[in-house]
Amino acid sequence: LFVRKPQIPILIDRTDNILVEMRVQAHKGDVLNKLSLQFKEGIDLNDIKALRFFYSGTEATSRQGKHYRPVSYISSHAEGKTKAANPAYSIKQSEVTDIANVVTFTSNQPMVEGVNYYWISIEMKPEASLLTTFTVQMPMAEINNMPATIVWDGKSDVRRMGIGVRHAGDDGASAYRIPGLVTTNNGTLLGVYDIRYNSSVDLQEMVDIGVSRSTDKGQTWEPMRVAMTF
């Protein structure tokens, strides 16, 4: 079982974030029956709303290399679809809402011959702090009810939180691009960006300049304001 943790922020405002993603080279009918995750480094487990274990199918034989997902599990650009897992590639196997230091997931999904993909999603509670950090390990996994060898791709890195200040489709705009961020003398955060109403493409298009403001170090953001129109 090959396991990787992508080094991207966990967005508090998302329903699903990639916590770990997995690849299994299987024979037809093999089953990844069980696996466990262990949280370390003092995370407040009450900040976690849910953990979900997904099966994501197989791989095209023509695609070369060692990958950890067949597609992007959560879109960064599809309007209204940037906060939750793509259901076409995320078949839920189990979900845990009673979060403990060690969490166990189960599955009865038969795998196909060749490469099979899985991933675990994490959803934070809205009140979770942006300062939250944690690491996670996988102490155990079973395939066909037998212990599986777990191979990590990279070290056990610290994961951090973030907020999606703007998402595709917010306020009726197709995309937001070219961001900037400044801190004023009194600590207020100002985020600026293109508001691309019709598509994410470059000029020539209908584009305004938007501003978002936070007075609590990025934990919450005021409604968007249009700073410049063209």
Language-model features: locations:
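Exposed, polar/acidic Ser/Thr-rich sequence context and nearby capping/turn residues
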Residues: 1-160
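Asp-box/BNR beta-propeller blade signature and adjacent active/binding-site loops
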Residues: 58, 89-94, 114-119, 123, ...
